[in-house]
Design a protein with these regions (language model features):
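Membrane-embedded catalytic cores of phosphoryl/pyrophosphoryl-handling enzymes
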Residues: 115-247
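Membrane-helix interface segments
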Residues: 30, 59-65, 151-158
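Alpha-helical transmembrane segments of integral membrane proteins
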Residues: 35, 65-73, 155-158, 179-183
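N-terminal transmembrane-helix/juxtamembrane module of multi-pass inner/ER membrane proteins
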Residues: 1-47, 81-127, 243-247
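Interfacial segments of alpha-helical transmembrane regions
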Residues: 48, 52-81
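Membrane-interface elements of multi-pass transporters and channels
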Residues: 25, 29, 57, 83, ...
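Alpha-helical transmembrane segments in multi-pass membrane proteins
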Residues: 69, 73-78, 82, 86, ...
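Transmembrane helix-bundle signature of multi-pass membrane transporters/permeases
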Residues: 71, 102-105, 163, 185-186
């Protein structure tokens, strides 16, 4: 037991040291502007919406299936899995427990000390706040990266750098430890791959029974290929088949 406890304490100390390195030693005026922006939604929400529209328009059935997977998998993971784990682990964020934490773009741009009223006696984050482990930002971005990679292999060239940038920004901004980000990335990528596989398997087994016409045209959600009738678009024909099945 003593050896295990010592190992855990060593890992925690390493986690704090890595956090300090990113949050303090890598600090510079350029990152102080870029990293809060990378963690925010001002740019990324319109980008995601525009990308979704472009995928449906240009990607035809493959793009439509990819967007549907993103719309199904990401909200479920963020609202149920990640938040449940955050509450169960109850790890306070770095700026709540460590001194001299930089929070660029936050309420305190200078080095901040943890407010005495924010942490509960048991060390858990306040009820109105959000825990540190895992990072939902990292989980969501790596989940999106995994789903995009499943349907578009070349997307890894720009999705992975974006996911890494957002994840790094969470440490730099003082709101997550490195282990929070690593755990979130692994959880998000693994959960997304499993969810896509499960939904595809469910479609393969139940689609044949409940939507035979649509299933005959689109038997696989992992490699979505539709053979439309002459003179009709793939997405348009898929929508027509769906309406027919639901009538």
């Amino acid at each position: 037991m003593g050896v295990k406890l010592q190992a855990v304490q060593s890992l925690q100390a390493l986690d704090v040291e890595l956090f300090r390195f990113v949050n303090e030693r890598l600090a510079n005026p350029f990152f102080d502007v870029v990293m809060p922006f990378a963690s925010g939604n001002v740019f990324f929400v319109p980008l995601v919406l525009a990308t979704g529209i472009l995928l449906v328009w240009k990607g035809r059935v493959r793009g439509l299936v990819c967007v549907l997977m993103l719309a199904l998998v990401l909200p479920l993971g963020d609202g149920l899995i990640y938040r449940t784990i955050k509450h169960a682990v109850g790890r306070p964020r770095p700026f709540l427990t460590l001194t001299e934490v930089r929070r660029p773009g936050g309420k305190n741009d200078a080095k901040a000390r943890p407010p005495p009223s924010t942490a509960q006696p048991n060390g858990r984050p306040p009820a109105s706040g959000s825990g540190s482990m895992p990072s939902a930002h990292a989980a969501n971005w790596f989940a999106a990266t995994m789903i995009a990679f499943i349907y578009y292999r070349r997307s890894i060239r720009f999705m992975l750098p974006l996911a890494l940038l957002v994840s790094f920004s969470r440490i730099y901004n003082g709101v997550h430890y490195p282990s929070d980000v690593v755990a979130g990335a692994a959880l998000g990528a693994g959960y997304a791959a499993a969810a896509v596989w499960l939904l595809a398997a469910l479609w393969g087994s139940s689609g044949r029974k409940w939507f035979p016409i649509l299933w005959a045209r689109l038997p696989s959600l992992l490699d979505p290929t539709l053979h439309p009738a002459p003179g009709s678009s793939e997405v348009g024909h898929l929508a027509e088949d769906t309406r027919h099945e639901l009538q």
